[in-house]
Amino acid sequence: MEARAIARYVRISPRKARLVLNLIRGKHVDEALAILKFTPKKASKIVEKVLKSAIANAENNHNMNRDNLYVAKAVADEGPTMKRVLPRAMGRADIMRRRTSHITIVVKEKEE
């Protein structure tokens, strides 16, 4: 049995979100929350919120025991990119890309 939580259109680059997700993949949920709490990255707050949602989904919707939960899957997929114009010298303009992510976390119960 698995429970999942998805945060879509999050205003953080998928590349930066993956740095944080790689830290928690395969870990027990309580250990993962502890890691996220002390990780000094913007993405860690967002990932922590999604992980807490996945844990709540597991407990409330699937009657799973929190003590046996671990992070089975943690991915950051690319969302739509917002393009903005950045004025430069001599009448030129650059495109600034504001990237978004879809963050998915799946938790499963450890098999005894």
UniProtKB/Swiss-Prot annotation:
GO terms for molecular function: rRNA binding; structural constituent of ribosome. Keywords: Ribonucleoprotein, Ribosomal protein, RNA-binding, rRNA-binding. PROSITE patterns: RIBOSOMAL_L22. One of its GO terms (cellular component) is cytosolic large ribosomal subunit. Belongs to the universal ribosomal protein uL22 family. This protein binds specifically to 23S rRNA; its binding is stimulated by other ribosomal proteins, e.g. L4, L17, and L20. It is important during the early stages of 50S assembly. It makes multiple contacts with different domains of the 23S rRNA in the assembled 50S subunit and ribosome. The globular domain of the protein is located near the polypeptide exit tunnel on the outside of the subunit, while an extended beta-hairpin is found that lines the wall of the exit tunnel in the center of the 70S ribosome. This is Large ribosomal subunit protein uL22.
